[in-house]
């Protein structure tokens, strides 16, 4: 499981960058905002990552901040929102703007992203409206965000590492966290989340 990379920015292209870590180049897909934040080629960078594993693919997605990765996981928990659409939304909107749009039910703002039609934007807004405040994206330092970066985030990463889609992993861990409470350990979260995901 690769959660973070620190190395030299080897190249920066459309929709992806290559990070050289000890002579190994990691191809990392990312939103336009993250790619802009990486700076000039040749510079030292740190990028938070999410690994997607499938039968015939292995993809590494990169995020400038851990909170952007948390929002990616939340977005992909919505049916019809895959990695490509989630990255398009994060390219079109700052995390704070995304949170405000969801909290206010402004689906038109979500629909600004490439590949997001009105119906999908409405579904995203409807399903995530009540969850928008949980990540604390406007300040970037709310208690729920720090919790998501701890055992909850680690449990989601563990499930995606086992081959679950980010959306499935997020939903299963959220259900496990609700059942076990805020003080749940990583082991307990993963164990219960696996049972939830298997249903």
UniProtKB/Swiss-Prot annotation:
Gene Ontology biological-process entries: DNA recombination; DNA repair
Positions of the UniProt region annotated as Domain I: 1-64
Major localisation: cytoplasm
Pfam families, per database record: HHH_5, RuvA_C, RuvA_N
Keyword Iron: no
Keyword Ion transport annotated: no
Cellular compartments per GO CC: cytoplasm; Holliday junction helicase complex; Holliday junction resolvase complex
SMART domains, alphabetized: HhH1
Record's subcellular location: Cytoplasm
Keyword vocabulary terms for this entry: Cytoplasm, DNA damage, DNA recombination, DNA repair, DNA-binding
GO molecular function ontology, one term from the record: four-way junction helicase activity
Start and end residues of each stretch annotated as Domain III: 147-199
Highest taxon, organism lineage: Bacteria
Entry domain remark: Has three domains with a flexible linker between the domains II and III and assumes an 'L' shape. Domain III is highly mobile and contacts RuvB.
Role: The RuvA-RuvB-RuvC complex processes Holliday junction (HJ) DNA during genetic recombination and DNA repair, while the RuvA-RuvB complex plays an important role in the rescue of blocked DNA replication forks via replication fork reversal (RFR). RuvA specifically binds to HJ cruciform DNA, conferring on it an open structure. The RuvB hexamer acts as an ATP-dependent pump, pulling dsDNA into and through the RuvAB complex. HJ branch migration allows RuvC to scan DNA until it finds its consensus sequence, where it cleaves and resolves the cruciform DNA.
Subunit structure: Homotetramer. Forms an RuvA(8)-RuvB(12)-Holliday junction (HJ) complex. HJ DNA is sandwiched between 2 RuvA tetramers; dsDNA enters through RuvA and exits via RuvB. An RuvB hexamer assembles on each DNA strand where it exits the tetramer. Each RuvB hexamer is contacted by two RuvA subunits (via domain III) on 2 adjacent RuvB subunits; this complex drives branch migration. In the full resolvosome a probable DNA-RuvA(4)-RuvB(12)-RuvC(2) complex forms which resolves the HJ.
HAMAP family, sorted: DNA_HJ_migration_RuvA
Family that this chain belongs to: Belongs to the RuvA family.
Protein name, UniProt field: Holliday junction branch migration complex subunit RuvA
Species name: Sphingopyxis alaskensis (strain DSM 13593 / LMG 18877 / RB2256)
